């Protein structure tokens, strides 16, 4: 899962949106650095990452990547799941329009920015103003996201080419998303994530 899915599942679970978004920017034990609700959100994010990576649908999708891009498949798939969530938001969350959800999420996250790591602050400078969560529905934007990650981290250069794997397996990936994401939504709503 990437930013949008983590925020969405956190909302459904009544967990800290801030902690769920912050988690990738925190190493080790967050308990001494953040309030309990944010810590709980960080832990939820980590559980979701482990759960998602081990879902049969996700493991199968990783195998569809070519040998030269398979190493970055988990990252590429995380971004792609956000694409499908953004694209199908009105079906998955009909009572909370995506643009309203993005404003709500931003308000929640802004409360922790003063005490956040610089890389997280930097992300927030772009995430909200450039409407990333809404733009995830556009595959051209997904390609830009993958290229941007590859540019910032040379060891992840294969992300540029992983775009072709997404394109080649788009329909099958969308089918897998519909197989697992509604289950995760139900788990979140029952606070079972």
UniProtKB/Swiss-Prot annotation:
<dbReference type="GO" id="GO:0008770">
    <property type="term" value="F:[acyl-carrier-protein] phosphodiesterase activity"/>
</dbReference>
<comment type="function">
    <text>Converts holo-ACP to apo-ACP by hydrolytic cleavage of the phosphopantetheine prosthetic group from ACP.</text>
</comment>
<protein>
    <recommendedName>
        <fullName>Acyl carrier protein phosphodiesterase</fullName>
        <ecNumber>3.1.4.14</ecNumber>
    </recommendedName>
</protein>
<keyword id="KW-0276">Fatty acid metabolism</keyword>
<keyword id="KW-0378">Hydrolase</keyword>
<dbReference type="InterPro" id="IPR007431">
    <property type="entry name" value="ACP_PD"/>
</dbReference>
<comment type="similarity">
    <text>Belongs to the AcpH family.</text>
</comment>
<dbReference type="GO" id="GO:0006633">
    <property type="term" value="P:fatty acid biosynthetic process"/>
</dbReference>
<dbReference type="Pfam" id="PF04336">
    <property type="entry name" value="ACP_PD"/>
</dbReference>
<keyword id="KW-0275">Fatty acid biosynthesis</keyword>
<keyword id="KW-0443">Lipid metabolism</keyword>
<keyword id="KW-0444">Lipid biosynthesis</keyword>
<dbReference type="InterPro" id="IPR023491">
    <property type="entry name" value="ACP_phosphodiesterase_gpbac"/>
</dbReference>
